[in-house]
Amino acid sequence: MTKKRKFLTILVLGMITAIGPFSIDMYLPAFADIAADLHTTVGHVSLSLSSFFIGISLGQFIYGPMLDRFGRKKPLFAGLFIYLAASAMCALAQSADMLIALRFLQALGGCAGMVASRAMVRDIFSVEDNAKVFSMLMLVVGISPIIAPTLGSLVTVELGWHYIFVILAIMALIIVLAIHFGLPESREADPDYSLKPAAIFRNFGLVIKEPQFYTYAFTGAAAAAGLYAYIAGSPAVFLQIFKVSEHQYGLIFALVAGGLIIATQLNRLLLRTYKSEQIIPVALCMQSVAGISLFVGSLTGWIGLAGTIILLLMFLSCQGFTFPNSSALSMAPFAKNAGSASALMGAVQMSLGAVSSGLVSVFSNGTALPMTAVMACCAIISLIILYFGKRMIRYKASDH
């Protein structure tokens, strides 16, 4: 693959990856406006975030087998058109419950891009390069919180929150065109791949039984669940508790995301010297320290706005190390069932994300405690999973 082709491929994969983060981050600054317009509370509106996570979690079980059976592009196109239509309908939502339902449908379509992009990385690039490519794609996850909330707040002020979803629909159309013209099919259709329920469950079973998969998929998902808790809780924490403006909230969100961007690029440099297996535990320890400090600080009241931002910056920067490395290690054992492996990994991540964001919403009490408590628990749980999972990997290796 030439450098130009590699750059173009990663660029288009990055655009596909952007669907999820933009769908989440862009409408966060509009929570208060949406709540006022639909005559409900910010907490009720935040359930549309949980429904989005649930839709992504369930949808990935559909697209994983389809990507292995029909190739990567056809199921991807189908999902993006569902996403486009649902985005347009979200713009017309007349109630919070309608928005929650439509966000679920939007996620069912958009998750095709998340599953396909991971599977295509496994198809196109060598196992050794996967972590580096995932680090580059993680740039999108880092950049989107800088661009999306700022754009979302601007659109909300100038045009109204409905137009956020119009822009998301237009973005989906642009991505469809980019895939059609700029991304070759990475895996041809496999007529022998069965879509019968028994065969699908058997393939998923083969994936989930692999110790390397469940160790790093669940470790990465638990760590990422802390990020989703932050996403769900940060509007209330900054807008209502610290009383910052929507514009200031967008700037804070962008500042914290900047740490994630720097970390992803530092991870690429570290991979020249260290293995992914060596980087992950160090990052998780740092994330746990930041999470516990946030919780204790919010419980005792000894940290203010500046301290909260600094600790959030530390916590979320660790995602730049854990996500690309855990993704690469989870996908490494699979070539034939890359679609199913990608679906399972994404479903685990989004399921835990739905749980963590849901817990923050349900236990919302006007303080930062629900968000910080969930974030701290996620970091600690990820360390526990990694410890016991690595023992299972060593046990399997000793059997052979």
Which residues does each PLM region occupy?
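Helix-loop-helix hairpin linking two adjacent transmembrane segments in secondary transporters
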Residues: 98, 135-181
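A late C-terminal transmembrane helix in Major Facilitator Superfamily
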Residues: 329-367, 374-375
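Conserved MFS/SLC helix-loop-helix module at the cytosolic interface between two early adjacent transmembrane helices
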Residues: 58-97
